[in-house]
């Protein structure tokens, strides 16, 4: 395949990618695992403190430079929605020229030597506009800009889909890989890149006979349509259930609960409660009577026959697609280029997790059963049902490990900047955006500054909710890193009458290029956007205080951002977060672990006047192990649904789910339920839902073995940067992890390595007291 735009991490990406590799020499150094914390804090700088004002007093920082006006993201041409449409058309012209150059390369040995580089250039040329358009589609408040973003996105993705199955491009690449002299001339980075390109073309059915390839295209189209239908069904509200006033007797909630009881008494009618509503959540937590909780659970996990049919058809089409290209199942096809490599390895990992988690989860379930026994004054331990979980173990909001003063957005960004300086010699610096550079007055611009090289990238922070903006938190890579001084653009050719369009596209790309000190070549520097929905500061109420889960979210997303900033590879297809699905969350999850350290939390104090120490703010939460076990079971379901058994005429997704829960689960399956139609990750993370658990396990191990005892140690930060972050997706993740942890036996990434990672999770998380 040619390329995959690098938009929101792991989401909303067209199935299309060109990828590259970086293989720079790694400096040798003595291994330095975590030791006693002896490193002193680096004092906060003026720039660090300026971050507080930037985000907590935005009225002071919204003045844009009117002496210098520009277009979106500093591109002078992008001043009007029409300019984005024009840019897409100009990019298409240049992409067609570059495609033709690659196709003609077989006529020249010199041109064949440029094929891998030109494939990456073609990918970057298209993705540079597609990724920008994707951000505009999801964040711009102007409808005309959104429409222009949609047009640009769809126009260039359509061309990408053509390239996906372009036999000529594949043939040219095969010519390179079948020529021993050319292969020998490729450095390891370029050779690995070529292999990845070849494998991706193979996945797109490129070598199939014409009729079979047409079937592949048809199935792919069906899968996209069914996927959209499945996601729509997953988010469709389930019908309400009737709850009698008498069933709400004794509600523990004295606020909403009292109001609901009064409503039922006043109307003299049953309450109609929608699953997932605030009322439903309150009843599940606070109703002593089991019946309303049971009814709400059944309603929340109901499905129509049509919804089940859509899911099962999607699963069958995926299985047919995989078998069309000679794979046993969709899981086999999907996992080929992941750390797991094959479904059997995922099974080894999940089995290890189950074996190690089950005792903790069973103990937790016994605690809940004892609570239920006492509540009902029963002579024996009762069975815990699915609707009992929230009542006997109500979820607590996440809390910091030690008491902290209120944390504002600016304070957290200041702490992040100080942490990055300690670890990597990199900091965040407020920058004034020019007039026209950002899409909304809320957006703040940050420079990412390396102490040796200066500015190495930019982060645009769009942190507050507004109408039309995408919900949730996300990290968008609008521009990837790559080396550009060896592009050889002069030999791309030209169509008659396209001079102005080519110039427009070239000028768009020229804005991105910079020469850094102490680094050979000219590079395109990364640019990312962070979207969140934090509370907005105001003049009357002052700076907005973040909930702890929002602090965790910010650290998580900034973990992705630093991966983009530090993973500056020569090939954009493997820069930053462009890596395997089951590896990409490691840097972001590891960032959350830093929030467990008092030394790191003290960085939120600009003047270092607060003494923080571990005093045991954690508490035992029996539901932590139960929830972990439930996540493992969902990962197992995902593997079953993408196994060869899907094509059996007797396959029934509900029966498969029920059998699995009753065989390996902790809480009995509830007849009549079909949760699988709401398991939206089955589409976006089909056969890879294990990835988050997998990366949590690795992150836990890295934290425990490398950082936990000295989290501000620069040597450890440099080690992690040099052995993991700087490579993006250009190096085998198993090699990176085994080197970082000094466990060479992991490098093979085989079944035993997967089992070993499964054991880590228990040692580092389930075995410890947790917070829910």
From Swiss-Prot:
Molecular function per GO: metal ion binding; metalloendopeptidase activity
Cofactor annotation remark: Binds 1 zinc ion.
Domain of life of the source: Eukaryota
Reaction(s) the record says it catalyses: Release of an N-terminal octapeptide as second stage of processing of some proteins imported into the mitochondrion
Cofactor(s) essential for the protein: Zn(2+)
Keyword tags: Hydrolase, Metal-binding, Metalloprotease, Mitochondrion, Protease, Transit peptide, Zinc
Catalytic activity, EC: 3.4.24.59
Subcellular location: Mitochondrion matrix
Active site feature: 557
Entry GO CC: mitochondrial matrix
Binding site for Zn(2+): 556, 560, 563
Keyword DNA-binding: no
GO biological process, one term: protein processing involved in protein targeting to mitochondrion
Disulfide bond residue pairs: none
Residue span of the annotated presequence: 1-33
Record-linked InterPro entries: M3A_MIP, Neurolysin/TOP_dom2, Pept_M3A_M3B, Pept_M3A_M3B_dom
General function of this protein: Cleaves proteins, imported into the mitochondrion, to their mature size. While most mitochondrial precursor proteins are processed to the mature form in one step by mitochondrial processing peptidase (MPP), the sequential cleavage by MIP of an octapeptide after initial processing by MPP is a required step for a subgroup of nuclear-encoded precursor proteins destined for the matrix or the inner membrane.
Homology family: Belongs to the peptidase M3 family.
PANTHER family, alphabetized: MITOCHONDRIAL INTERMEDIATE PEPTIDASE, PROTEASE M3 THIMET OLIGOPEPTIDASE-RELATED
Protein name: Mitochondrial intermediate peptidase
Species this protein is from: Coprinopsis scobicola
